UniProtKB/Swiss-Prot annotation:
Glycosylation sites recorded in the entry for this protein: N58, N125, N258, N344
Catalytic center residues: C86 (nucleophile), H147
Temperature-related properties: Almost completely inactivated after 10 minutes at 50 degrees Celsius.
Pfam families: Sulfatase, Sulfatase_C
Protein's recorded name: Arylsulfatase L
Organism: Homo sapiens (Human)
Free-text tissue specificity from the UniProt record: Expressed in the pancreas, liver and kidney.
SUPFAM superfamilies, sorted: Alkaline phosphatase-like
Post-translational modification: N-glycosylated. The conversion to 3-oxoalanine (also known as C-formylglycine, FGly), of a serine or cysteine residue in prokaryotes and of a cysteine residue in eukaryotes, is critical for catalytic activity.
Length: 589
């Protein structure tokens, strides 16, 4: 058995070299690489701007480990997220499908899952690449952020849990980091809820005082019962406004190992070492492969949890410190691959779920990312800054080092790419929007298979791009854009995030047209007077939109009001509710 095991390891170590020889001998080498079953390591940052990384043009942020991946592999410069916010983008990444197909969108403004104790989530009838790879014999793990739902009918059914979507192992947050986890002034939920509760308290207190005065002066013929009830309700609301912050911290900011809560609420100073320890443990346990590991970083989402030895070290404040710490984490993971002899047999992919947030700002201090030359940011369905993200692939000896590809690609492309590498079949019973990237990465194809890409904001189509290959032109058409606040600011600074519909968006007739191949910053609007083929482009894009919309089927919207309200009976709790507190694992080594 020892001899056979050693032979297996030797074969896996020679695999990349053998594949490289095949690539040099035959133009159809990509078909030889299919089903080669490498280990697959997927790294996804949270809220990272494409301009935050050295290899994408930042010369003041230190990201040597991510830059090394690009130097040793293939860098995609037109890599597009299917959505500009966390939940829908991650759903599209895992399924290879626009989030509107799975219902991971909203029509009322709830654009991501709002609570761990909500019933919405990635539907069980969706097929993730993890599910297919597990069926093909891969060990599958997810470490870090999930944010695709947890429970449906009870606090323990875990119907949306990663382990029900193809992952053998899960360690991390079933929800997402938020400013509220650290009771930051930059608040996603707490401040808004406190304001509403305080308003209701004032109303009920006024009612109670009015009834008391009317009762004592005999002007209002009322019994004492409604007076007492209104007064008690006012006191309860006042108490709730004080405790809502603690409720959010305990309800959403916790860690799980598989189906068990290990830390509620999270101890931030332990989080990064625990994540790294878990990654190293998974790699060591499964080094005889094959494995799929999805490391979904909590970085660089607010509240920007950063260890003390990285604080104050960057040139860009706390946000820069957090980016540089994440890069250090990438380096530690790469070191583990080297130590375990896995580097040459592992395909690595690095990306972000969407663009950096421009509205994360307190005074003159920016707590969000930089999107480089691209307009807009997180939450903006059509502008490039919200959806153009890093895309780096490394597979030593197989993928050419230092290659740069400017063709349009999508996060959804990872689905068919890894399924093909694992020897699996892409589902034929549903529309898969992603395209296999292997021919493009290997250089056996010069053009992306994406002629069109659609850009949604919630369930509303805001923009579309057309790659007109015969002209070498990348057209971008905007049907709807948000109204920036203040005007011309490039972001919605009066809000947490730009809206998708309503009075604060503009519906363009005719739509806005840009040529991204000459104007990637989307600064020069083309008109019939300035662009001779204006109407032909509009007609072709509109036809593509109609063809795309004909492939859509009605599905329940997981992020609408019913699926996105907090339900106490769905709330995970490792102690007597609402005193949810536990610490079940030792400090990291």
């Amino acid at each position: 058995m020892l001899h056979l095991h050693h032979s297996c390891l030797c074969f896996r170590s020679w695999l990349p070299a053998m594949l490289a020889v095949l690539l040099s001998l035959a133009p159809s080498a990509s078909s030889d690489i299919s089903a080669s079953r490498p280990n697959i390591l997927l790294l996804m940052a949270d809220d990272l701007g494409i301009g935050d990384i050295g290899c994408y043009g930042n010369n003041t942020m230190r990201t040597p480990n991510i830059d090394r991946l690009a130097e040793d592999g293939v860098k995609l410069t037109q890599h597009i997220s299917a959505a500009s916010l966390c939940t829908p983008s991650r759903a599209a990444f895992l399924t290879g499908r626009y989030p509107v197909r799975s219902g991971m969108v909203s029509s009322i403004g709830y654009r991501v899952l709002q609570w761990t104790g909500a019933s919405g989530g990635l539907p069980t009838n969706e097929t993730t690449f993890a599910k297919i790879l597990k069926e093909k014999g891969y060990a599958t793990g997810l470490i870090g952020k999930w944010h695709l739902g947890l429970n449906c009918e009870s606090a323990s059914d875990h119907c949306h849990h990663p382990l029900h979507h193809g992952f053998d192992h899960f360690y991390g947050m079933p929800f997402s980091l938020m400013g509220d986890c650290a009771r930051w002034e930059l608040s996603e939920k707490r401040v808004n809820l406190e304001q509403k509760l305080n308003f209701l308290f004032q109303v009920l207190a006024l009612v109670a005082l009015t009834l008391v005065a009317g009762k004592l002066t005999h002007l209002i013929p009322v019994s004492w019962m409604p007076v007492i009830w209104s007064a008690l309700s006012a006191v309860l609301l006042l108490a709730s406004s004080y405790f809502v912050g603690a409720l959010i911290v305990h309800a959403d900011c916790f860690l799980m190992r598989n189906h068990t809560i290990t830390e509620q609420p999270m101890c931030f100073q332990r989080t990064t070492p625990l994540i790294l320890q878990e990654v190293a443990s998974f790699l060591k346990r499964n080094k005889h492969g094959p494995f799929l590991l999805f490391v979904s970083f909590l970085h660089v989402h607010i509240p920007l949890i950063t260890m003390e030895n990285f604080l104050g070290k960057s040139l860009h404040g706390l946000y820069g410190d957090n980016v540089e710490e994440m890069d250090w984490m990438v380096g530690r993971i790469l070191d583990t691959l080297d130590v375990e002899g896995l580097s040459n047999s592992t395909l690595i992919y690095f990306t972000s779920d969407h663009g950096g947030s421009l509205e994360n700002q307190l005074g003159n201090t920016q707590y969000g990312g930089w999107n480089g030359i691209y307009k807009g940011g997180k939450g903006m369905g059509g502008w490039e800054g919200g959806i153009r993200v890093p895309g780096i692939f490394r597979w030593p000896g197989v993928l050419p080092a230092g290659r740069v590809i400017g063709e349009p690609t999508s996060l959804m492309d990872v689905f068919p790419t890894v399924v093909r590498l694992a020897g699996g079949e892409v589902p034929q019973d549903r529309v898969i929007d992603g395209q296999d990237l292997l021919p493009l990465l290997l250089g056996t194809a010069q053009h992306s298979d994406h002629e069109f890409l659609m850009h949604y904001c919630e369930r509303f189509l805001h923009a579309a791009r057309w790659h007109q290959r015969d002209r070498g032109t990348m057209w971008k058409v905007h049907f709807v854009t948000p109204v920036f606040q203040p005007e011309g600011a490039g972001a919605c600074y009066g809000r947490k995030v730009c809206p998708c519909f309503g009075e604060k968006v503009v519906h363009h007739d005719p739509p806005l047209l840009f040529d991204l191949s000459r104007d990637p910053s989307e600064t020069h609007i083309l008109t019939p007077a300035s662009e001779p083929v204006f109407y032909q482009v509009m007609e072709r894009v509109q036809q593509a939109v109609w063809e795309h919309q004909r492939t859509l089927s009605p599905v329940p919207l997981q992020l609408d009001r019913l699926g996105n309200i907090w339900r106490p009976w769905l709330q995970p709790c490792c102690g007597p509710f609402p005193l949810c507190w536990c610490l079940r694992e030792d400090d990291p080594q």
